[in-house]
UniProtKB/Swiss-Prot annotation:
Pfam families: DHquinase_II
Disulfide bonds: none
Keywords noted in UniProt: Amino-acid biosynthesis, Aromatic amino acid biosynthesis, Lyase
Protein name: 3-dehydroquinate dehydratase
Family: Belongs to the type-II 3-dehydroquinase family.
Source organism of this protein record: Helicobacter pylori (strain J99 / ATCC 700824) (Campylobacter pylori J99)
Amino acid sequence: MKILVIQGPNLNMLGHRDPRLYGMVTLDQIHEIMQTFVKQGNLDVELEFFQTNFEGEIIDKIQESVGSDYEGIIINPGAFSHTSIAIADAIMLAGKPVIEVHLTNIQAREEFRKNSYTGAACGGVIMGFGPLGYNMALMAMVNILAEMKAFQEAQKNNPNNPNNPINNQK
């Protein structure tokens, strides 16, 4: 399964940006940790990473995923979480599971950070666990996609399903 990981504004500055809040781990190190998690778990997962500081590029990337071989999206929209209805709309149009990740617990921060338009559009939000949150999102995504595939397989094999090829034989 192929999963797109989208990183928003200022995440390229991890390791330098307010280490008291975000720690010393860089974005590249977070991506390496995710790749290691995939390898150690022997998961059949291909990760693609994308980082931008521009709202429109995040929207473009989500839209590009529509009809592609990406099965899910893990996104940290950064501060756009609190301001971007446009990214939230793109998430709702993605047609695939989307999980939002935040390194910090946005509910424990400034009042203006407590609302997440993008989080409301996602299937779930993981926050406050630092870099571990990305592996938590990855684990959740793998399980969600496995459940979806199992459900689709069960539907396909259901003799009462009008789309079952057995029911179309004459």
